[in-house]
């Protein structure tokens, strides 16, 4: 039932009014109609919905109950125990439709005042209109119909100047901008089901229909910008810029606030090869030193600095009661805009007619007054406080090496490399932060028990957890005993501590292009090495025995121990799935021995107790069930793993047809190309062949893989014609 259609067009026009004024305009329009977007079914394989022997072709039509709706055992439906029946019902009976319209018009006027002074006025708008209609059949039916739209408009004007006086060059611009964005949302839906199932109109609601709508957010910004460019003898250049923003997002209800903020920059470069042109070796084409310092300011979300409230209803037997509630985010009276101060130095080197080129950059940046939310005691009536958090530092290097090892009349081989390495550090945080700020996940709650945090002295996004394996005063791992399964498992530390860093050691790429006459082949690799991720599909899939990792110790072939049980209820049975974890039992551990007696095994070695015949090896199923269950997990390489990969990102074949052929077809030039992207991984460090690029989001603090996301490749054939 899922489809996607899109229609789009782009129109551009220019016109010269006279010798010194010309105008240009364009409109970009697209209309998309997605229906029933694909669902993320990856978690179904680890949350118990589907088992490894699940046959979707067999079960996909066995979900309906006799009285209608999803099959249920309490109605005596024959398909009441079908796994995943709700999923199949929703796939078949739910209907989610959207219609997205995007319009982006632009307009500009260019005026040539003198030979060295120009003026430009421009305006653009980004209009996004989304309408949705959701139909859900079944218990708690809902027919959600609504839309939301976003307007973004920008108006600007700028003066540009360029003037050369003997050995000196002066240029630059002065510009002003006005930016406005507004977001509206409207929705209406049924409540409590429908009077007549399958009749899709909101007045068919059993209970009074619910609606919501209005202006959700609005922000305006005024900006004044200037740039000054100076040059001397085409050797030395100096650029100075400045910008002042006035943001409505930092204006308090009483019209105060730090809504105006200025941030400058300065950069310089020296072309060494021009200064020493007479003495420079001929094989050096370019040698440039560059350095810069810049400051960037940033505001926050609309309404973030002002107290707001939510509007809701409570359903009563005689109608609805309308309620208002203040938000749970505490505001501060003097929120400052964020500031990022950065500097960098670099070298650009071109040699051998640009066949060997090197770009090197070292940078360092500090973000101060970063706007973040910190947790506060709920007894205060709020749950979080918006603050200027502190000082976050980033530094690193970037290297690009471009080479052409072979270049002849018909052949050319290009080989390019990039390398980037970034390191971050939390220099300081807000005084109200006792230890750390959680950025993503939860250090000691829910099924997470691991989170990326901001902690003074550590990297941004360092990972902390309270479920590392506990150890005694001598550093020996501690174990617990499960008497029902007669097996040991790792004891949790219950103390939050740093377990690693999510930041990669480095990122890199390799691209090579081989060209023979008009035919070329390009291959691109991307790579990442280092940095931790937490895979919950590995965690729960291993607990349930659905991953390759859970095969270890299952039988002798996979390292399992063989023994004959001496417990009374299993005496004489031979098992082949045994393992003996390293460690001693934690204080207060009582275990039932082989002879049926109970014994305090605190501080005793599990391996020694097995050797003495008092306990037996732990079954593999018990080990995985206890160590990887919801809330019982402990940090190990299956759940939290170093992420490294080499991706085969792109293969492209391009052929430029001879002019004799393209001219016959009425074209000046004709190119044919075939591209294949994301073809797979030459190296992948994650267990169980997980997709290494399936981290939940692109956030700088995200480290989680929640489901089995499939590998997706794309194949594109392109015809490019010039007329």
List the predicted regions and their residue ranges.
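Extracellular/periplasmic, surface-exposed regions of secreted and cell-surface proteins
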Residues: 12-21, 26-31, 39, 76-134, ...
């Amino acid at each position: 039932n899922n489809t996607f259609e899109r229609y789009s067009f782009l129109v551009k026009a220019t016109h010269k009014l006279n010798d010194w004024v010309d105008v240009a305009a364009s409109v970009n329009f697209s209309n998309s109609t997605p229906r029933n977007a694909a669902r993320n079914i990856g978690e179904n394989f680890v949350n118990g919905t589907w088992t490894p022997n699940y046959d979707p072709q067999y079960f996909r039509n066995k979900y309906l109950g006799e009285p209608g709706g999803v099959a249920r055992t309490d109605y005596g439906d024959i398909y009441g125990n079908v796994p995943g029946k709700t999923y199949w019902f929703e796939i078949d009976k739910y209907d989610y439709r959207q219609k997205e319209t995007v319009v982006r018009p632009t307009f500009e006027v260019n005026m040539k005042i003198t030979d060295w002074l120009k003026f430009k006025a421009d305006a653009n708008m980004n209009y996004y209109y989304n309408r949705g209609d959701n139909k859900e059949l079944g218990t708690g039916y809902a027919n959600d119909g609504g839309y939301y739209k976003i307007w973004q408009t920008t108006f600007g004007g700028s003066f540009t100047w360029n003037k050369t006086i003997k050995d000196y060059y002066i240029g630059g611009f002065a510009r002003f901008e006005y930016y406005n964005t507004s977001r509206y949302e409207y929705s209406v839906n049924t409540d409590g089901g429908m009077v007549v199932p399958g009749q899709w109109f909101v007045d068919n609601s059993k209970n009074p229909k619910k609606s919501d709508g209005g202006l959700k957010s609005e922000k305006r910004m005024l900006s004044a910008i200037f740039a000054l460019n100076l040059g001397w003898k085409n050797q030395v250049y100096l650029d100075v810029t400045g910008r002042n923003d006035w943001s409505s997002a930092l204006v308090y209800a009483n019209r105060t606030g730090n809504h105006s903020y200025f941030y400058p920059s300065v950069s310089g470069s020296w072309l060494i090869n021009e200064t020493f042109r007479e003495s420079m070796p001929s094989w050096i084409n370019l040698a440039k030193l560059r350095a810069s310092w810049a400051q960037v300011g940033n505001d926050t979300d609309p309404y973030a600095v002002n107290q707001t409230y939510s509007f809701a209803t409570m359903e009563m037997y005689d109608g609805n009661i309308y309620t208002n509630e203040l938000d749970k985010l505490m505001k501060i009276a003097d929120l400052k805009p964020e500031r990022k101060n950065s500097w960098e130095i670099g070298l650009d080197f071109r040699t051998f007619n640009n066949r060997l080129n090197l770009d090197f950059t070292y940078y360092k940046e500090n973000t101060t007054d970063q706007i973040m939310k910190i947790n506060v005691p709920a007894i205060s009536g709020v749950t979080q406080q918006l603050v200027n958090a502190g000082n976050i530092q980033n530094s690193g290097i970037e290297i690009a090496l471009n080479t052409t090892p072979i270049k002849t009349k018909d052949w050319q081989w290009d080989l390019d490399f990039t390398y980037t390495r970034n390191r971050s550090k939390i220099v300081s945080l807000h005084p109200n932060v006792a230890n750390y700020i959680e950025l993503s996940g939860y250090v000691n709650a829910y099924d997470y028990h691991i989170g990326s945090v901001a902690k003074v002295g550590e990297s941004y996004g360092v990972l902390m957890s309270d479920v590392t394996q506990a150890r005694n005063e001598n550093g020996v791992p501690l174990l617990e005993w499960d008497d029902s399964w007669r097996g040991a498992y790792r004891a949790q530390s219950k103390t939050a501590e740093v377990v690693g860093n999510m930041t990669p050691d480095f990122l890199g790429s390799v691209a090579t292009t081989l060209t023979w006459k008009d035919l070329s082949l390009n291959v691109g690799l991307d790579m990442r090495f280092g940095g931790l991720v937490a895979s919950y599909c590995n965690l729960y899939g291993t607990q349930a025995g659905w991953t390759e990792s859970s095969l270890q110790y299952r039988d002798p072939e996979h390292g399992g121990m063989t023994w004959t049980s001496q417990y009374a209820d299993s005496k004489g049975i031979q098992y082949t799935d045994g393992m003996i974890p390293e460690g001693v039992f934690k204080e207060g551990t009582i275990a039932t021995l082989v002879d049926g007696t109970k014994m305090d095994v605190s501080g005793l070695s599990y391996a020694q107790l097995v050797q003495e015949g008092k306990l037996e090896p732990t079954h593999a199923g018990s080990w995985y069930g206890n160590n990887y269950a919801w809330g019982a997990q402990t940090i190990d390489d299956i759940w939290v793993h170093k992420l490294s990969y080499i991706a085969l990102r792109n293969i492209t074949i391009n052929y430029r047809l001879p002019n004799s052929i393209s001219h016959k077809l009425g074209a000046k030039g004709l190119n044919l190309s075939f591209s294949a992207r994301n073809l797979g991984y030459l190296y992948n460090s994650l267990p169980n062949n997980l997709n290494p690029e399936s981290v939940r989001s692109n956030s700088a603090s995200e480290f989680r893989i929640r489901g089995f996301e499939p590998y997706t490749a794309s194949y594109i054939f392109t015809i490019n014609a010039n007329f």
